[in-house]
């Protein structure tokens, strides 16, 4: 077994005294072997549904995460406000792209993350996993060339477009890219 282990734990982070949303924790855990160390009896129905959907979606991407080539795109240690990585199959026909907002500023401008490891000649359809936004991303279901994605990346929104009572400082995205044949 070669995949990194990542688990989904408590909502409250003792080191930072902050509450980290379930979506963000799921997206981090999905970048390894998705594990959940939480009590279902303490979860709302909405949280249970989000976890069930994440498990189902993870089953689709698991071979790519566990056996694909890893590309570390932006390090959280660079303090640019974003961390990002992706996995790509050896055939370059499927990929999982991860994006996490790591810093919290007012009127911030986050860098656009260029992807890596894709085939320049292939076309890829983009689908967001674990979506919580009221509306899909502007590029949901659209097709882009590997050349474009590696030269430009995609414009990732800094925040989730959710109802007011669900807004918070954390934002994360998981994108599934699949070759269009």
Q: Where do the protein language model's features map onto the residues?
A:
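Single conserved hydrophobic/aromatic residue that forms the stacking wall/gate
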Residues: 1-8, 12
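Short acidic (Asp/Glu) and glycine-rich catalytic loops that position anionic groups and cofactors
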Residues: 9-10, 28-39
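Active-site loops and adjacent core secondary-structure elements that bind or stabilize anionic groups
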Residues: 11, 64-67
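Aromatic-lined glycan-binding groove of carbohydrate-active enzymes
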Residues: 18-32
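Conserved, mostly hydrophobic/aromatic
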Residues: 29, 97, 126
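N-terminal leader/propeptide and maturation segments of large enzyme subunits in energy/redox metabolism
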Residues: 36, 41-49
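Carbohydrate-binding surface patches
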Residues: 77-120
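C-terminal beta-sandwich/jelly-roll accessory domains of carbohydrate-active enzymes
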Residues: 103-181
């Amino acid at each position: 077994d070669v995949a990194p282990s990542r688990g989904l734990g408590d909502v409250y982070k003792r080191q930072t005294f902050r509450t980290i949303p379930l979506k963000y924790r799921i997206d981090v855990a999905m970048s390894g072997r998705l594990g959940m160390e939480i009590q279902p009896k303490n979860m709302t129905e909405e949280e249970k549904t989000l976890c069930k959907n994440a498990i189902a979606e993870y089953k689709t991407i698991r071979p790519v995460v566990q056996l694909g080539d890893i590309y570390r795109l932006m390090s959280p240690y660079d303090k640019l406000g974003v961390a990002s990585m992706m996995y790509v199959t050896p055939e370059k026909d499927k990929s999982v792209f991860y994006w996490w907002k790591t810093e919290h500023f007012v009127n911030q401008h986050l860098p656009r993350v260029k992807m890596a490891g894709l085939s320049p000649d292939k076309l890829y359809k983009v689908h967001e996993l674990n979506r919580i936004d009221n509306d899909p991303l502007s590029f949901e279901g659209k097709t882009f060339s590997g050349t474009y994605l590696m030269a430009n990346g995609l414009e990732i929104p800094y925040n989730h477009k959710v109802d007011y009572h669900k807004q918070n400082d954390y934002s994360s995205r998981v994108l599934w890219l699949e070759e269009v044949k």
